[in-house]
Amino acid sequence: MAIEKSKLRLDGRHNLEKVLPLAAPYSIYLDPASACNFKCSFCPTGHQELVTGFYKRSIMSFSMFENIISQIGMFPCPLKVLRMNKIGEPTLNSCLPEMIGLARASERIEWIDFATNGSRFSGDNIERFLRSGANRINISLE
């Protein structure tokens, strides 16, 4: 019988009941693009009839992102995780590498990552993402 080891990183974790109320959030999910270039049957983002009434498909402006990073800087302690995706495909935002670079340069965010379908990675474009300052890029192959 094989013993499986958890892939969760448990080192440095806090028991929330001992640290509440929090002085700042541990993590924030931002959506640089609330649209997607795929229409996966299992994902609500690809179903126009499901999402029409719930959210507007759009691309976040760089100035809006700058404002958010500025506000994150006002927290009394650094943010542990910034996830640069939620509903949409983040690479649809052409400013994504620069956004990640700005977040990294703020020195107020410990870990930055995003998940992507990878369809927009090619040539020099992928170099921009690899040099952006992201700790991890998750490519979802569905």
Residue ranges of predicted features:
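Conserved alpha-helical substructure of the radical SAM core
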Residues: 2-137
